[in-house]
């Protein structure tokens, strides 16, 4: 059984680089992957460590390829002052990424 994904797409939002309270480096990417008929999928990706440092230099429009796995996590969405809802987010945890020279 395996959970692996390969994506070939374009950075569509400036990467967000930060450090966790424990000092781990992390970068959030949003990748646009083109589909037939002029449609695109927008896939959130998360990078750690060296990959996060590398990804932090990406610019919008840059062509990249990503290898990773799909992961899910639960979070609490605040709907009103008193109301919350448990939700699930899915994202790609990146193990390898590279720029594609056009």
Task: Indicate residue ranges for each PLM-predicted region.
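Single-stranded nucleic acid-binding surfaces, predominantly the OB-fold ssDNA-binding core
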Residues: 1-102
């Amino acid at each position: 059984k395996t959970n692996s994904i390969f994506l070939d797409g374009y950075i569509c939002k400036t990467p967000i680089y930060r450090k966790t309270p424990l000092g781990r480096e992390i970068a959030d990417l949003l990748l646009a992957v083109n589909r037939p008929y002029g449609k695109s999928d927008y896939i959130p990706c998360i990078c750690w460590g060296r990959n996060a440092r590398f990804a932090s230099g990406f610019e919008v429009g840059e062509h990249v390829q990503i290898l990773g796995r799909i992961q899910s996590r639960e979070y609490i969405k605040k709907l009103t002052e008193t109301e919350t809802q448990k939700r699930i987010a899915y994202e790609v945890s990146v193990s390898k990424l590279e720029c594609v020279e056009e």
